[in-house]
Amino acid sequence: MSCKHTSYTKTIILCLQKVKHLVNWTKFQKNRTMKKGILLTLLMMAFAATAQESVLLRLNYNKADNYVTSIELKQSMGAQGGMSMTMFMNSNVSSVNDQSIMLESKVESVVINMNQGGMVMDYDSNKSSEELDQMGQMMKSQFDPILKATIYNSVDRYGNVLEVKVEPSLPGMEQFTGGQNAINFPEEEVSIGSSWESESENQGMKIVTKYTVANINDGMISLDIAGDVSGIGTGTLIGKSTVEISSGVQTNATIEMNLSAQGIEMNLITTSTMKKI
């Protein structure tokens, strides 16, 4: 073998070695980069898991705050007819301390449309007696005292009702406060997937409601609602609700209840909103 050929061979071997070294170095860098990427992804996943937002739900009204609540109820009883009602209520936060919050509320307007057993009844509190038919005038005589009454409602930071007083006193009037903040908050912080239950009794019916956190975003918490009804009526309910985290105000809610009572099947859908004015 000539010296020239030997020199070429050495050069080729040297080049191949350099290429091999370069390939190995490239693989090393690629693997190193991949490992860094995997490590970074794992760290981000771990951070996301530990940094999942948890919130503490409490009522945080301020004295002199004013809120308007709208409640829309649609009731269907199949062939027996149905009813729709829209109500607006204004509430003023009259006092606040560490233990309780006092609200003064007044029903501002009520609109009812009813069709039961072929009998049609319409009532609008914004209309005068002259603008209402005979049935509407009868309903006006029943609702006028309600529109003139003031409801004094005391609640704690968890949303539990401590006391309800109506002036002048009207039986059943306290039921009109039900749509303002019907959620009882848990003691602990909650995050997505958290759930808790509350119980209430209303006119002979016991309602057990389960709230599950569906989402937390932009200062709001979204809840899925499910529940069971027992007592003089039996049934189920489902719905959704949105709560402002900073104030604890239930800004909107939709609840559908299917109820059987005294041989009558009913479907009730209640939609409520509450906003600061």
Q: Which residues are covered by each model-predicted region?
A:
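Solvent-exposed helix/loop surface patches that form functional interfaces
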Residues: 141-218
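Bacterial Sec-dependent N-terminal signal peptides
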Residues: 1-57
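Acidic, serine/threonine-rich low-complexity disordered tracts
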Residues: 52-121, 194-277
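A short, charged
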Residues: 7, 138, 143, 253-262
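Short, aromatic- and cysteine-enriched interfacial helices/patches
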Residues: 23-25, 173, 232
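Mixed-charge, low-complexity intrinsically disordered segments
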Residues: 106, 112-146
